[in-house]
């Protein structure tokens, strides 16, 4: 099916939203990496940063709600739907783990490898939908998921090793000598600045990236399975308030368990956060949640697919110029295969509509601000956020 660009970008505003959506997600990995010390550690408390991000988003959501209502009305809505507030604790906890693991994994992997490996969430989500919702995958869907997995695995392939069986003549000997020199350089650059740039290496870092992926998928599926009907009639900004309140509690509990709850807000620790390189992370991650809601309101899933593919490409290019992270053949091929797999998957994505009428076209998303489908899409999109 051909793509009508006028239909994808009906106004200049939609194109601006698309650029913002893509730029914010690219900036997420770039800003976190740029805020690291020379040994890839953080000179600030990352859990506190995640907590302050949730506080900032709570303030923004409250202000957006109060444009047409007042604080008293918000309190009434929270009391009326307090059972939904309790239900949000599960996805809030999962996203809390996801957001904190993002800092851990970006200290281990370079941003390009990190985003490539996170695409495995499409595979996990597809399998979970088949198990929980009995939404059996078609042949095309299975092919796309297999391609996506192979694309992520391709990041670890050393194409220089394919020349190891060459004949031992003068020409091949020269090639082997060059390859040995190249492999030494590659080995050093693969862990440049202490970063893992080869993908999975069957270590604790692989467990952490898998845990982050699974947390994202489980949180998204939980929202579909439990909150689709019970939360569909709740104002979207009230739903955001529920999520951010529960997220603040979860992050506070993590600080408490680590014995850092009081010390995290000491003048010294807050001073380490009140730097441009850290504050921009908080603002960027808060903006992601806001722009995503506009993205889903004015655009469709095809653009979301294009955005995911372009994020991988531009992240690799920016990391090359900003952090001198090389782009090898395996990285380029992995990005190409994963991007195509995502595109193929979205031609017939696995969805669970429940009791909600699906949108027939793009204009339906903007006709009614209370359209239930929009609420559900915004809720499900939380699983695609890198640090929400």
UniProtKB/Swiss-Prot annotation:
GO terms for molecular function: UDP-galactose transmembrane transporter activity. GO terms for cellular component: Golgi apparatus; Golgi medial cisterna; Golgi membrane. Disruption phenotype: Lethal in late larvae and early pupal stages. In immunologically unchallenged third-instar larvae, displays abnormalities of the immune organs, including melanotic cells in the hemocoel and melanotic tumors in the lymph glands; in the primary and secondary lobes, shows activation of lamellocytes and reduced numbers of hematocyte progenitor cells and plasmatocytes. In addition, displays hyperactivation of immune signal transduction via the Toll, JAK/STAT and JNK pathways; shows reduced expression of galactose-containing glycans affecting also spz glycosylation. Keywords: Golgi apparatus, Membrane, Sugar transport, Transmembrane, Transmembrane helix, Transport. It is found in: Golgi apparatus membrane. The keyword Transmembrane applies. It is a multi-pass membrane protein. It holds the Pfam family Nuc_sug_transp. InterPro entries: Nuc_sug_transpt. One of its GO terms (biological process) is positive regulation of protein glycosylation. The chain crosses the membrane at residues 13-33, 46-66, 84-104, 113-133, 142-162, 202-222, 236-256, 276-296, 309-329, 331-351. Belongs to the nucleotide-sugar transporter family. UDP-galactose transporter involved in the synthesis of galactose-containing glycans. Plays a role in quiescence of the innate immune response, possibly by regulating glycosylation of the Toll pathway ligand spz. The gene name means 'Buddha with a thousand hands manipulating tools to protect us' in Japanese. This is UDP-galactose transporter senju. It comes from Drosophila melanogaster (Fruit fly).
């Amino acid at each position: 099916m051909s793509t009508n660009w006028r239909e994808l970008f009906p106004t200049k505003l939609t194109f601006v939203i698309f650029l913002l959506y893509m730029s914010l997600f690219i900036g997420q990995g770039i800003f976190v990496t740029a805020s690291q010390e020379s040994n890839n550690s953080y000179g600030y408390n990352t859990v506190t940063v995640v907590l302050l991000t949730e506080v900032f988003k709570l303030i923004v959501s409250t202000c957006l709600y109060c444009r047409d209502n007042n604080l008293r009305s918000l309190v009434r809505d929270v009391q009326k739907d307090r059972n939904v507030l309790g239900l949000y604790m599960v996805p809030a906890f999962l996203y809390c783990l996801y957001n904190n693991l993002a800092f851990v994994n970006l200290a281990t992997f370079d941003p390009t490898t990190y985003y490539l490996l996170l695409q495995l969430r499409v595979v996990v989500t597809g399998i979970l939908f088949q198990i929980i919702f009995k939404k059996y995958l078609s042949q095309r869907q299975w092919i796309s998921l297999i391609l996506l997995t192979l694309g992520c695995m391709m990041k670890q392939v050393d194409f220089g090793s394919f020349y190891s069986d060459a004949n031992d003549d003068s020409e091949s000997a020269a090639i082997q000598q060059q390859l040995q020199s190249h492999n030494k350089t590659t080995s050093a650059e693969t862990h440049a600045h202490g970063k893992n740039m080869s993908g999975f290496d069957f270590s604790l870092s692989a467990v952490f990236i898998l845990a982050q992926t699974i947390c994202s998928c489980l949180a998204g599926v939980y929202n579909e399975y439990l909150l689709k009907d019970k939360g569909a009639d709740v104002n979207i900004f009230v739903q955001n308030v529920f999520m951010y309140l529960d997220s603040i509690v979860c992050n506070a509990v993590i600080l408490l368990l680590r014995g850092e709850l009081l010390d995290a807000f000491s003048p010294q620790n807050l001073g380490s956060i009140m730097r441009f390189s850290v504050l921009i992370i908080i603002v960027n991650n808060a903006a992601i949640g806001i722009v995503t809601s506009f993205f889903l309101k004015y655009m469709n899933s095809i653009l979301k697919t294009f955005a995911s593919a372009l994020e991988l490409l531009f992240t690799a290019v920016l990391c090359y110029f900003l952090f001198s992270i090389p782009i090898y053949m395996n990285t380029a091929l992995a990005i190409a295969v994963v991007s195509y797999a995502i595109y193929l998957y979205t031609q017939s994505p696995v969805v669970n509509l429940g009791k909600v009428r699906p949108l027939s076209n793009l204009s339906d998303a903007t006709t009614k601000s209370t359209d239930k489908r929009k609420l559900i899409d915004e809720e499900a999109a939380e699983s695609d956020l890198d640090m929400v």
